[in-house]
């Protein structure tokens, strides 16, 4: 576009933008382009973000990491990363979305065209998440439907899928004492591996499609589609239920868990501090990666959700509250998990360490085994899998919403028209469903593990976080971004946030990133099955496909821009002049200012000429 400056009679210059040839759009097309929309109120934004960041990892990952890494001592490195990385980067992404009113790709493109690959990388990660995360919902639906029986099907060894090595819970202790068989299995394990997954011997043998899981996956996608098909108008209403219902289930399970025999021993096992574990660098790496996982950082979701805020929304206060809510939920979930694991260990007469699990092993093996030992086991099974379903559901459809938002902001003239959004969501759902069918084959679990271990791994998130804080702190300028934030919320955030962007966060991300690489251990399914070399190659391809976006788009944008290298670099680190500048009111808030002392031209020139840290 060309900039056109006119001067009013009062002497105030006004900037307008004239489309260049090829950018003209007839009036009919203009009228058809719909507005992005905004949240109806703050609560819709808060619940949507809470639904995205508070998910399955809070229940099945954090408690296990806490017990594994020194109990209460784990909170020391956890809160160091919480204040130096979690809150600063979380706030950065939300504020960026609110400031630019754009999805992940176009927001970074406007802030710094040279580093727009950050946004593209987040879209790649979102795409992977949309393919594999919803598989967990299909499993949860399968277990939920299986819970509506007189006897839970994973209680006994008399089912058609059980083998001669199956030993039910009543005979478990005596079998252990007699060493009846070194290869004995439990009915809950056989239900999981033989009835639900039908798992094969390895990734080389995918087997046939598990049609029941395929139907559950289809149902999950249908639910997700109708949760977001009308944009923030529908998403904002759905999260009132999906984001709050898991808390009701969590409270019910907490009350039930702490009243079980053996619960106290389980909670002590969860929280008893072992300060000597802090000497192990692995503890610190686990704390850092857990922060990035649980806060949904570098996935583009926070930027997209923040983009639907009003310009003067206090996103700083919201971000801090949401971060504390997320960590508090993880902490409380630990009481639920370990009170029930303590009960299960006491009932079986084994140490708690033998029943402690993380990930799918906790959700689909340990907990189903625990509920069979309770009175009214069908009720507790239904409640638990309903909680899992809703914990994962809002994370899934909000992630899909953010992917759609990024796409529509990249191509507004084509996609932001009547009926186009619904078709885009339908197309994304169909493509992701068809690709997801590969993960509900008999060998699909091996592929799921590759996605989970590599596609959205801590290495990818740490790498992108490093470039995010470098972009805002050093290229765009931390002081300049603080000016933008002050213009939005009316005051400047705590100085520690800026210090974190400039020094603490990049330092910790870089150190943790290289340590993660040095301590890399190849994926093993159940710590037994070793993938073939081509399987690991696929995993690393998934990881590098997102990280490679940053250097790749740096090279592409430099090659496409004309001029000397210095001029190209200067142009590519210059923010888009259409971004709001301090003193210029946002049109979406219904106010405008024509003040000569802070004219748009003057503000724009200040923004363009202000030196960056680079």
UniProtKB/Swiss-Prot annotation:
It is found in: Basolateral cell membrane; Cell membrane. Residues 574-600 are annotated as: Disordered. The keyword Kinase does not apply. It is a multi-pass membrane protein. It catalyses: 4-aminobutanoate(out) + chloride(out) + 3 Na(+)(out) = 4-aminobutanoate(in) + chloride(in) + 3 Na(+)(in); glycine betaine(out) + 2 chloride(out) + 3 Na(+)(out) = glycine betaine(in) + 2 chloride(in) + 3 Na(+)(in). Keywords: Cell membrane, Glycoprotein, Membrane, Neurotransmitter transport, Phosphoprotein, Symport, Transmembrane, Transmembrane helix, Transport. Transporter that mediates cellular uptake of betaine and GABA in a sodium- and chloride-dependent process. May have a role in regulation of GABAergic transmission in the brain through the reuptake of GABA into presynaptic terminals, as well as in osmotic regulation. Probably also involved in renal and hepatic osmotic regulation. Interacts with LIN7C. This is Sodium- and chloride-dependent betaine transporter. The gene is Slc6a12.
């Amino acid at each position: 576009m060309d900039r056109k400056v006119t001067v009013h009679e009062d002497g105030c210059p006004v900037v307008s933008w004239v489309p260049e040839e090829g950018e003209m759009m007839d009036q009919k097309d203009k009228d058809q382009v719909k507005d992005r929309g905004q949240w109806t109120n703050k609560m819709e934004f808060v619940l949507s973000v809470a639904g995205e960041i508070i998910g399955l990892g809070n229940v099945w990952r954090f408690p296990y990491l806490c017990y594994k890494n020194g109990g209460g001592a784990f909170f020391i490195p956890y809160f160091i990363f919480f204040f130096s990385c979690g809150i600063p980067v979380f706030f950065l992404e939300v504020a960026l979305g609110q400031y630019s009113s754009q999805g992940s790709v176009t927001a970074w493109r406007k802030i710094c065209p040279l580093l727009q690959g950050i946004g593209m990388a987040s879209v790649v990660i979102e795409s992977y998440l949309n393919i594999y995360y919803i598989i967990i919902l299909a499993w949860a639906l399968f277990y939920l439907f299986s819970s509506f029986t007189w006897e839970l099907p994973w209680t006994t060894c008399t089912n058609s899928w059980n083998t001669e090595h199956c030993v039910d819970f009543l005979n478990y202790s005596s079998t252990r004492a007699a060493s009846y068989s070194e290869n004995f299995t439990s009915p809950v394990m056989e239900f999981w591996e033989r009835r639900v997954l039908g798992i094969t011997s390895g990734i080389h043998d995918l087997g046939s499609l598990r049609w029941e899981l395929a139907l559950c996956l289809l149902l999950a996608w249908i639910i997700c589609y109708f949760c977001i098909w009308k944009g923030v108008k529908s998403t904002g209403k759905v999260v009132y239920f999906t984001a709050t219902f898991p808390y009701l289930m969590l409270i019910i399970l907490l009350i039930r868990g702490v009243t079980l025999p053996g619960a106290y021993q389980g909670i002590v096992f969860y929280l008893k501090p072992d300060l000597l574990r802090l000497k192990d660098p692995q503890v610190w790496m686990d704390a850092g990666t857990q922060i990035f996982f649980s806060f949904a950082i570098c996935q583009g979701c926070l930027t997209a959700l923040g983009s639907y805020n009003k310009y003067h929304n206090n996103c700083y206060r919201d971000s801090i509250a949401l971060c504390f809510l997320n960590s508090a939920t993880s902490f409380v979930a630990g009481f639920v998990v370990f009170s029930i694991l303590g009960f299960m260990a006491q009932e079986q007469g084994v140490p708690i360490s033998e029943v402690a699990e993380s990930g799918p092993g906790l959700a689909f093996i340990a907990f189903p085994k625990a509920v069979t030992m309770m009175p009214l086991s069908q009720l507790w099974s239904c409640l638990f899998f309903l909680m899992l379903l809703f914990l994962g559901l809002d994370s899934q459809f909000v992630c899909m919403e953010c992917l759609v938002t990024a796409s529509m902001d990249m191509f507004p003239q084509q996609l932001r028209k009547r009926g186009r959004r619904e078709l885009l969501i339908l197309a994304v759902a169909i493509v992701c469903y068809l690709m997801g069918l590969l993960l509900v084959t008999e060998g699909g679990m091996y592929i799921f593990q590759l996605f989970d271990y590599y596609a959205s791994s801590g290495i990818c998130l740490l790498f992108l976080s490093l470039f995010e804080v470098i972009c805002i702190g050093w290229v765009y300028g931390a002081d300049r971004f603080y000016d933008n934030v002050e213009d939005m919320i009316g005051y400047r955030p705590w100085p520690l946030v800026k210090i974190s962007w400039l020094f603490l966060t990049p330092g910790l991300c870089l150190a943790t990133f290289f340590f993660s690489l040095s301590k890399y251990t190849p994926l093993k399914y159940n710590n037994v099955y070793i993938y073939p070399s081509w399987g690991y190659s696929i995993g690393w391809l998934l990881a590098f496909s997102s990280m490679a976006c940053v250097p790749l788009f740096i090279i592409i944008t430099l090659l496409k821009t004309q001029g000397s290298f210095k001029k190209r670099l200067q142009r590519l680190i210059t923010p888009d002049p259409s971004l709001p500048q301090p003193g210029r009111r946002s049109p979406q808030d219904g106010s405008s200012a024509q003040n000569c002392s802070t004219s748009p031209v003057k503000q724009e020139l200040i923004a363009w000429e202000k030196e960056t840290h680079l």
